[in-house]
């Protein structure tokens, strides 16, 4: 057998292996999408393929060809993840890859938009991040792959040449260009939070802001920091208003960490911050002031 035939058979075996835990998800009008078995009764899929108006009519196509009903455990639109549950508990959970994704490595997108698995082959073109999604989520990392994304592939696994999962593929993050997958380590963390809370709590101060360059005086007050966030709006009754933050203040630090733009602020307002008290350093009227804020939860 030639080396090419050996490689071809190896990749086909990888698709077959991944197909054992890849399911069909019919949760919207139009074509079905795909999902990944997290546990015997839990499925991970892309949030954008689950129509909120059809949550009571979800159908899951299993690898053995049967079909069962599904329900929503929770979802996180910001990272395009949703978790579904089936009653039968008959799924084979996905096998995670032991190695981190490598740029230049072969990878397969496996999907089940119909009764049988489909696949697309490509190269991992890069592992990038952090970046913010169009829905406001912050991704520490994401995987880019040049495989073709056919209809119904969103929610399916990106697997290595052994058929072990590297991440979940999705077209719902709005990046354009190559296909994008969320790394399995990140997906697993978010999935755990969704299972506990039904969503991913995100910190909220209740301000509208824009980045500004600090004046020489403000820069000195901020310890040499060159930029900050000008508060242009304060939500009535929100955490910032309760703490006494005012329109026109310049927020320069949160718990001692410099804030130069909105991404800096959001990175400091993760799920673990919700409900906690933080110290905000603001420049106001030529003075540096410290305010104590209780981080709220963004609904």
Please provide the spans of the model-predicted regions:
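C-terminal cap/linker of serine protease catalytic domains
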Residues: 1-15, 109, 161, 165-226, ...
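Active-site region of chymotrypsin-like
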Residues: 19-21, 82, 86-94, 118-177, ...
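PDZ/PDZ-like domain micro-motif
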Residues: 152-157, 213-222, 235-253, 268
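Short loop/turn microsegments at loop-to-beta-strand junctions
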Residues: 32-33, 153-155, 229-231, 246-247, ...
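Conserved active-site neighborhood of the chymotrypsin/trypsin-like protease fold
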Residues: 2-3, 22, 27-118, 142-143, ...
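Conserved PDZ fold ligand-binding element
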Residues: 40-44, 166, 240-263
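A cytosolic small-molecule/anion-sensing beta-strand core signal
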Residues: 38-39, 160-161, 255, 284
């Amino acid at each position: 057998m030639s080396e090419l035939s050996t490689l071809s058979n190896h990749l086909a075996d990888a698709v077959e292996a991944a197909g054992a835990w890849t399911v069909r998800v019919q949760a919207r009008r139009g074509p079905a999408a795909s999902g990944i078995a997290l546990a015997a009764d839990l499925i991970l899929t892309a949030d954008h393929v689950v129509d909120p108006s059809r949550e009571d009519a979800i159908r899951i196509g299993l690898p053995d060809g049967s079909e069962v009903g599904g329900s929503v455990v929770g979802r996180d639109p910001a990272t395009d993840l949703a978790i579904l549950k089936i009653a039968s508990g008959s799924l084979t959970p996905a096998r995670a890859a032991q190695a981190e994704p490598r740029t230049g490595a072969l990878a397969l997108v496996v999907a089940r938009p119909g009764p049988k698995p489909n696949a697309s082959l490509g190269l991992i073109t890069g592992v990038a991040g952090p970046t913010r999604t169009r829905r406001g989520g912050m991704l520490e990392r994401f995987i880019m792959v040049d495989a073709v994304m056919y209809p119904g592939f969103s929610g399916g696994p990106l697997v290595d040449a052994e058929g072990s999962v590297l991440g979940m593929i999705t077209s719902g993050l709005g990046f354009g260009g190559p296909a994008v997958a969320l790394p399995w380590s990140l997906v697993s963390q978010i999935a755990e939070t969704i299972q506990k809370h039904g969503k991913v709590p995100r910190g909220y101060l209740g301000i509208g802001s824009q980045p500004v360059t600090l004046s020489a005086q403000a820069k000195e007050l901020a310890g040499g920091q060159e930029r900050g966030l000008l508060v242009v709006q304060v939500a009535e009754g929100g955490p910032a208003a309760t703490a006494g933050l005012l329109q026109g203040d310049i927020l320069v630090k949160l718990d001692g960490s410099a804030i130069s733009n909105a991404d800096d602020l959001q990175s400091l307002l993760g799920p673990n911050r919700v409900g906690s008290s933080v110290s905000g350093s603001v420049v106001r009227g030529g003075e540096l002031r410290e305010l104590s804020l209780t981080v709220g939860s963004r609904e």
